[in-house]
């Protein structure tokens, strides 16, 4: 497990964040949400955009409650993965 600070530094260099390790450490109460939905495209299921959006918004809104400014989006060029920036 890396720290949220280390994840933010990596995200600055790579333009994407190590989402699972960073957010689970900062917000353990949403660990199950992340584990269930972080790799939505890897199970071969065809998720609709609105399905992606509700998880992005759920994570974003939870982070905002803790005072983070958050941008969350899915990148669908290399499969579906969630990138969250703060």
Description of each model-found segment:
Residues 1-51:
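An N-terminal amphipathic alpha-helical segment
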Residues 37-74:
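Acidic, low-complexity, intrinsically disordered interaction modules
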């Amino acid at each position: 497990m890396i720290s949220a600070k280390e994840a933010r530094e990596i995200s600055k260099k790579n333009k994407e964040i190590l989402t699972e390790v960073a957010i689970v450490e900062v917000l353990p109460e949403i660990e199950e949400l992340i584990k269930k939905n972080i790799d939505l495209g890897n199970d071969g299921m065809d998720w609709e955009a609105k399905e992606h959006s509700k998880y992005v918004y759920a994570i974003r809104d939870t982070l905002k409650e803790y005072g983070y400014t958050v941008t969350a989006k899915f990148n669908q060029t290399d499969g579906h993965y969630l990138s969250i920036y703060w």
